[in-house]
Amino acid sequence: PEGLEVVFGRLRTTIIGIRYGAPFNLPLKVDNELELISRRLSTKQAKYITFEVMMPTSFNGTFGDITFPTSSLIFSSLVDKWNAGDMTDVLDKDLIRTVADKVRLERWEGHTKRVFYGRDRGLTGFVGKFTFNISKLAEEENQLLTVLALFGQHCGIGRLSSQGLGQVRVTLQNK
């Protein structure tokens, strides 16, 4: 929506154009899902997944927002977004959560950050780099989580991702 005024805290700006790129230069069409999966399955199994959270995000918790990522929170969020989309197959969230619970956080560097999206409304979220060790997973589990992680570059993670929060860059490492 060109000409729309956007306010983040004290920053006030006007949208003059929108550019969008799909992960891995995939074409923006229905075949993205199958292309993403086939590209991932044809490569070597990853040992680490790094999520670089570029825009603050948090997760819904029972007693308020959760401002630190766990593998279970990240992948549950991604499954919800996958299943909400126009995907041909719905993924089992409980199964994904069980697989994600086997993954451990190897290293992290991040901090909380407050973002205001209205005069008196804001979100305290987190930003930073979070590397998860997935080397102990079975091949099928590894492939499932890496496809979901790469999908996260398209949809974001956590709360308010449709408003631009929770944008991530994902890096897969074999060493």
PLM regions: where:
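RNA-interacting cores
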Residues: 1-175
